[in-house]
């Protein structure tokens, strides 16, 4: 049996959790918070991990895993280098998608919306809360650019450690946060026999409305 044939045979049942129109919250942010509280109790690894998808100038989609670092006023916040590939793509096309997947609970959340930078004050506050070596790494890494080798990065990091010691570090201007302002959010609950639950929220003017989608 080939490896590809065996891959086709990999499957599992998802259990008894469910999501109905009646049990769903009226707005998706309340529903997300409700699910996320459960996730923090049940997911062992990286509960804040989310796939961020953007589109480059050629129209090619691009995805990577980033970490959710805030949910403020209904907006999803993450941080990155403003000169990275994702930042360049966002600059040209300020729309993105997020995908959360929590396998222990067989739950998935998909988000689509507009992207904009958060305030410098917010970025400063988060940057100063990071471990010191993580702050140094943000300074020395020219994210998404070709580098000679890993040793050069480590040497630059060690040099900064010697230079700064325990002194406060100023956030570099090319590093900070983005918020995704959602226009659509879908909640997916895995069910047995592949008859999954899907509740899709979308903006209707200034209000949210939701509907059930077929799996």
Curated annotation (Swiss-Prot):
Gene name tied to this protein: pdxH
Gene Ontology MF terms: FMN binding; pyridoxamine phosphate oxidase activity
Superkingdom assignment: Bacteria
Keyword Coiled coil listed: no
Pathway participation: Cofactor metabolism; pyridoxal 5'-phosphate salvage; pyridoxal 5'-phosphate from pyridoxamine 5'-phosphate: step 1/1; Cofactor metabolism; pyridoxal 5'-phosphate salvage; pyridoxal 5'-phosphate from pyridoxine 5'-phosphate: step 1/1
Subunit relationships: Homodimer.
Residues at which substrate binds: 11-14, 69, 126, 130, 134, 194-196
Organism this protein belongs to: Legionella pneumophila subsp. pneumophila (strain Philadelphia 1 / ATCC 33152 / DSM 7513)
Purpose: Catalyzes the oxidation of either pyridoxine 5'-phosphate (PNP) or pyridoxamine 5'-phosphate (PMP) into pyridoxal 5'-phosphate (PLP).
Note on cofactor: Binds 1 FMN per subunit.
EC number: 1.4.3.5
Binding residues annotated for FMN, in chain numbering: 64-69, 79-80, 86, 108, 143-144, 188, 198
Protein name: Pyridoxine/pyridoxamine 5'-phosphate oxidase
């Amino acid at each position: 049996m080939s490896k590809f044939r065996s891959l086709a045979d990999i499957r599992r049942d998802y259990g008894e959790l469910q999501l109905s129109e009646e049990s769903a919250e009226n707005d998706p942010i309340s529903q997300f918070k409700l699910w996320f509280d459960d996730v923090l109790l049940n997911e062992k690894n990286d509960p804040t991990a989310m796939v961020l998808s953007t589109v480059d100038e050629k129209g090619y989609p691009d995805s990577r895993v980033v970490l959710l670092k805030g949910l403020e006023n209904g907006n999803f916040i993450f941080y990155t280098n403003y000169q990275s590939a994702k930042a360049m793509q966002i600059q040209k096309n300020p729309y993105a998608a997020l995908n959360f997947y929590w396998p222990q609970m067989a739950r998935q959340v998909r988000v689509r919306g507009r992207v904009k930078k958060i305030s410098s004050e917010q970025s400063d506050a988060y940057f100063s809360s990071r471990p010191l070596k993580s702050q140094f790494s943000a300074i020395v890494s020219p994210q998404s650019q070709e580098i000679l080798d890993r040793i050069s990065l480590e040497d630059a990091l060690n040099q900064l450690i010697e230079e700064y010691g325990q002194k406060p570090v100023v956030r570099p201007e090319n590093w900070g946060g983005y918020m995704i302002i959602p226009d659509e959010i879908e909640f997916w609950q895995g069910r047995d026999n592949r008859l999954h639950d899907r509740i899709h929220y979308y903006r209707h003017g200034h209000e949210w409305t939701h509907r059930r989608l077929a799996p």
